[in-house]
Amino acid sequence: MLAGVVARPSECVELVEEEDAGLLSGELEVDLIPQGTLATRIQMAAMGIPAFFTPAGYGTEIAAGKEVREFNGKMHLMEMALYADYAIVKAWKGDTDGNLIYKETARNFNPLMAMAGKITIAEVEELVPVGELDPNYIHTPGIYVHRIFKGEQYEKRVEQRTVRKRTQS
């Protein structure tokens, strides 16, 4: 499984500690990747670049087993592009040719994942006929989308806000 965020930090600890959660049983493989490195790995795959060097993660457990090189006096790790057999993306609006428009933070990873996937499946909130989308606002051209469908039910999930208690002055 590849995901930018799979759970809140407290839930991540539970996932690691529970024997039947998959990690300890060997059913689930986890690769911890810094967020910027993850984005760049996807971007490189989308652009057809097989690998790149980054200083992120050098000197940590993330560096284990990776090629290391020095550039301008700074150590860098070689990271491989991250291709996907299937990319599942969600867009706000799309047309029947697969052209997609995303809203807000959905623009962060969805366009790159759509380009990095061998087969991209897009779910849209609104599916319109070809020609109804303004080409100036399309984030993912239909050439990258292999399947498109209109979603039916959406549950708005909000992260639980956690703050520290106010101290008395």
Residue map of PLM features:
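Conserved alpha/beta enzyme-core scaffold
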Residues: 1-169
